[in-house]
Every structure is written in structure tokens, then in C-alpha cells.
Design a protein with these regions (language model features):
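Acidic, polar-rich low-complexity tracts and alpha-helical solenoid repeat scaffolds
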Residues: 2-6, 22-347
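Proline/serine/threonine-rich low-complexity "mucin-like" segments in extracytoplasmic/periplasmic regions
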Residues: 1-2, 12
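Bacterial N-terminal signal peptides
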Residues: 9-19
Length: 347
């Protein structure tokens, strides 16, 4: 297969416009994320702005069309001729003629069928997956009301997965392409939030955010996935991934008590949402976070245990610490120091 990942990436991203104004007018009642919903009405935290999505370009007749234009004189005859070529296994030639039909007679009744046949032939007969994706995209961009939207979007998504997996095998290219591929999946979710693949796509987006090292955005994506598709298997997988991403942020950033407490709260909730091996994993993360909070609380208590502070302040600080962490790692040390301070105060 030809290596044309950049056109593929641009192609997926452009899919975002597959339900522009004509389609949206027809489907204005379809909102939310239920089955059949074609476009998102809410913000998607962790996604990039739609401003960065490439606008589609309409096909135009080629120069010197008398040489490389359609062979037949009308769209109906041209489509029949293309099907004959495919039946004769002249698929490459058929693709050129199908493309010529769409360019020459874009408003004809045969144009949507020709565009679909072009995409299918590239994918199923020639294995040209990147080109096929671009043609499915074009079908959705310009013939969204004349095609089976859900079926075509599903085919485009399957091709996106194939191309993403192939990109993984090219190590020196994979990481350069991560951002563009993520934006491609985002555009699919934004324009087809009710599709069967939407939750799976969001899980992929979260993983790609992690690949970029954008763990805070990954957390947002996973959290939104759980909220939008709570009963999906991807929502269950997102719990552990969100926990791991939150921990990366916690470990890499300067200590922040609010962030730490928020993470501890999430991990407590996560225990009720997971099962199997994930339970033990979440518990180990929870213990790590609680250890961070305890260490911070102990540092705060020791802050009051100095010559510039009164013994009463230090005693109160250690008592507060022990009331919160009676069995903590620093509890014994805090008790010993508390007894010393109380003994000194009675002298």
C-alpha cells in the first residue's frame, strides 16, 4: 500500500464537516449522544478546537478533460461503464472513470452512487485504504443526504483504525503523527456522537493524548467518556486509564494539596466502579496519594514545632495531624513529639 499518511490525516480531520448545514437542517431534532445522533451539541473537554479542522474542497473537472475526462457522454452511461470495468477486474481504470463522473456531473443522480463505488473499490478491490478514506469522507462531505450516513461513517471509522494501526509499525513516523490522528478521531466523535464507535473512539483519543504527554487532557477525555457513555465497556476501561493519568500528573507536577485531594476523591469513587485486578491497582494508587497527603500534613505540623512558635501551637498541630492520620506512617513520631511537648509544658 502506498504511504500517504499525511493526506489520510487531513482526510479524517475533514470528516468533521460531514453534516454541515443541509444535513443539520434535516436532523435538527437529533441532539445529545443517543443512537443516530449525527453531531455534538456539547463541549468535549480534552479535545482540540474545531477551528483547526481543515475545510473540504469540492472536486472540479480536470484540465484537458477531453483527454482525462469521462469516457461516456452522460452520467448514466458512465456509471454503467464503470461497473463493467470493475466486473472485468479493471479496477484502477474504473476508479479513474468514477472520479471523472463525479467531477463532470456532480449534481447528477449517479454522482453519489459513483462516489460510494469509488470508495468501496479503492478499499475492497485495491487495498488503497488511505485513498478510500478520503473518498468516503468526500461522500459524507458533499452527499450526506444521498447516502447511508451511519453505514458510511462506520466504514470510515474502520479504515481510520486500520491506518492508525499501520502507523504504529512505523516507529519514526508514529509519534510525529499522533496529534493529527487524534484530531481525526475527535472530528469523528464531534460529528457522530451517537455512532456505535463513539465511545471506542474517545478511548482512543484519551490514549493518543497520553502518547502526546498531555495527561491532564487525557483525564478530561476519560472523564467525559464515562459521563457520556456510562454503560459502555470503554467507560469501564477509562476508569483505570484516568486513574493512571491522574497519577502521572500528580507525580510530575509540584505538590498541590487541592490536586492531591481531588485525586484521592476520584480514586475512592473509582474503587466502586472497577473490579478484578483493577481494584488492587486502584488501591495501591490510593495508598500512594494518601501517603502524599499525610506527608504534607506532617510537614505542616512540624512547621509549628519550632523556636519561633509556642508549644501550644505545636501541640495543637500534632493533635490535628493524629486525629486525621492515627495509623499513618508518621503517627508514632508525632505521638512521641506530642508527649515531649506536653511534658515540657507541665514543667
Amino acid at each position: 500500500m502506498k504511504s500517504k499518511m499525511f493526506p489520510f490525516v487531513a482526510g479524517i480531520a475533514v470528516l468533521a464537516v460531514c453534516v454541515l448545514s443541509p444535513c443539520m437542517a434535516q436532523q435538527s431534532a437529533m441532539t445529545g449522544v443517543g443512537p443516530g445522533v449525527r453531531y455534538a451539541t456539547d463541549a468535549y473537554p480534552g479535545f482540540d478546537s474545531e477551528d483547526e479542522i481543515v475545510n473540504p474542497e469540492k472536486k472540479e473537472p480536470r484540465w484537458f478533460s477531453f483527454i482525462n475526462g469521462p469516457k461516456m457522454g452522460d452520467s448514466k452511461s458512465q456509471l454503467r461503464y464503470c461497473r463493467e470495468l470493475i466486473a472485468a477486474d479493471s479496477c484502477s481504470r474504473a476508479c479513474k472513470e468514477l472520479d471523472a463522473l463525479v467531477r463532470e456531473w456532480p449534481m447528477s443522480p449517479e454522482a453519489p452512487a459513483a462516489q460510494l463505488l469509488l470508495a468501496e473499490t479503492l478499499s475492497e478491490k485495491l487495498g488503497e485504504y488511505e485513498d478510500a478514506f478520503a473518498e468516503y469522507r468526500y461522500l459524507l462531505d458533499f452527499y450526506s443526504l444521498a447516502c447511508d450516513y451511519s453505514a458510511v461513517a462506520e466504514k470510515a471509522y474502520r479504515l481510520a483504525n486500520v491506518l492508525r494501526e499501520e502507523g504504529k509499525s512505523v516507529i519514526w513516523f508514529r509519534f510525529d503523527n499522533t496529534v493529527d490522528v487524534r484530531r481525526a478521531y475527535e472530528s469523528l466523535v464531534l460529528r457522530a456522537p451517537g455512532a456505535a464507535f463513539a465511545s471506542e473512539a474517545m478511548l482512543t483519543i484519551g490514549g493518543l493524548r497520553e502518547d502526546e504527554g498531555k495527561y491532564e487532557q487525557a483525564v478530561q477525555v476519560y472523564e467525559n467518556l464515562r459521563n457520556l457513555y456510562p454503560d459502555s465497556k470503554e467507560a469501564a476501561a477509562a476508569v483505570r486509564r484516568e486513574a493512571d493519568s491522574r497519577m502521572v500528573v500528580l507525580r510530575e507536577r509540584e505538590y498541590n494539596r487541592s490536586r492531591c485531594k481531588d485525586t484521592a476523591g476520584f480514586l475512592g469513587s473509582a474503587l466502586a466502579m472497577c473490579d478484578g485486578d483493577d481494584v488492587q491497582h486502584i488501591r495501591s494508587l490510593q495508598e500512594e496519594v494518601l501517603s502524599m497527603l499525610e506527608a504534607d500534613a506532617f510537614r505542616s505540623a512540624k512547621f509549628y514545632d519550632s523556636r519561633v512558635r509556642t508549644s501550644r501551637s505545636a501541640i495543637s498541630a500534632y493533635e490535628r495531624f493524629l486525629s486525621e492520620y492515627p495509623r499513618g506512617r508518621h503517627a508514632d513520631e508525632a505521638r512521641r513529639r506530642l508527649e515531649e511537648l506536653k511534658g515540657d509544658s507541665q514543667k
